[in-house]
Structure formats: structure tokens, C-alpha cells
Amino acid sequence: MTTIKPFLNDQFLLETKVAEVLYHDYAKDLPIIDYHNHLSPQEIAQNRQFETISQVWLAGDHYKWRAMRTLGIDEHYITGPADEKEKFRKWAETVPYTLRNPLFHWTHLELRRYFDIDELLTPDSADRIYAQCNAQLQSGELGARDLLVNMKVETVCTTDDPLDTLSHHQAQQIEGHAPQLLPTFRPDKFLMIDQPDYVSSISELSTLVGKEISRWEDLVHALQTRVDFFHGKGCRLSDHGLAKVYAHSSSPEALDGIFQKCLRREGVTVREVQ
């Protein structure tokens, strides 16, 4: 007789004996070095205490938001003013439809690993799981930093705006808390010249570095100044959210001409953006 494994078990995703040995005997207890995420440096540095699982899961997870929107959930329950329990119930309605999507696996792995809950999240189990998670979160032992330490996370590299002061990274380093909290340089906003807030971003950067930015070369130098600042705070990575890899070559003079158009708030063509 064939024994059917439950959805989550100690051999989850381990389909061969070799896989089981490699994971359990070698990989399982190794520290995690998370070199890309969208976690909040402030929440980690301050070890934010969460009152509800909705605050952990639904307050800023655009993957969950997209799944809920795809299912037709009203925005009121996604980023709107609905209360946290209502939002969680709507997420519970969505979860069964994410089968074969990583969201389904992530949801149940997190319930099992962080909260010791093996039950599948469905509309029927939603209120019960909501209460169980909240009780554990409100114990004072599952703050933002605690959750990472419990999973043996050794290093966290957050995604950071070049304008960021990195004060929370510095506070974490000074206080000596685990995990190591390092910044990642994400300069997208200074390359997206077609965005309506582009000029205001340039103005903020100019103020921060204490130099006027009126030419393309000035922008390059200003960003280099911020790279140096980030480097001094432990940054060794950059992150670029490019929709595609651009291949149009351009001279420094042409780049400066496009930049001047942006500063004058004139429209730019698709070719100029690329």
C-alpha cells in the first residue's frame, strides 16, 4: 500500500534519498545570507513587534496583492481601509487558487516554520489560523528581528534608495544585533527620466550631496558620491529593476542633451528613455 505524504512534511520538495541527505545532513542548519529582499531596515533595527499576521503578510507584499486582484478581490480589502481580519479572510479565500504558484508553498511553509501550524489556509480555517498566529506574535518573542534570527538568517541585504541616510543599518551595526544588516544600492529613480517626479528626485540628490546637478556629468558624479557613502556603510551590491536590457549606445553629449530636456520638463521619446 502506498502511503500518501501530507502536503507539508520534513521531506517537502525532497523527492529522492540523495536530496534528503543533502538537505538534512548538510544544508538544513547552514546560515542564510539573504542578498536581495524588500524588508524594512527600520523594522529590523527596531525589532518591530507585530500585533497581527496581516501586518506581517499583507501590509506590503505586492505578490499577494497581485494574486488577490487577479481573483477579483476589491481593493478595499487589499490596500484599502478594511480591517486586518477582513483582509486576512480575503487572502485566505485567495490562497487555494494559488496552487502551483510559489505563493501557495510560501504561505504554508511560513505557517509551519514560524508558527508550527500544519493546517492548510482556507476560508474555513482562516479565523482559527488568524487567532493562533496573532497569539504567538503578541508574545513579544516574534519581532521582525526575532523572526530572522529564528531562521538562522546571518546577513540581510536590503534594497535602498540612493537618498537614504542608512541610519537604521548603522544603528543595527552599532548595537551589534544579529542579523548583519547591509544596504544595497538601487538607483532606478535616477534613470527613469520619463517619470513625473524625476526632476524633484534630482533636486533632492543635489541637496544631499551639496552640489548643483545641471548636467549629465554632474548626475554621474553625484551618484558616485552616494555609492561611496553606501560603500562606507558596508554596501557591496547594487540592484537594478530594468524592464529590459537597453542596447542603444549614446555619446556623452547626446546624454547631456536628453538630461537637459528632462530638467526643462520637456517630453522625452521612447528612444531617449532607452
Model-flagged regions — what are they?
Residues 2-274:
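Metal-cofactor-binding active-site regions of metalloenzymes
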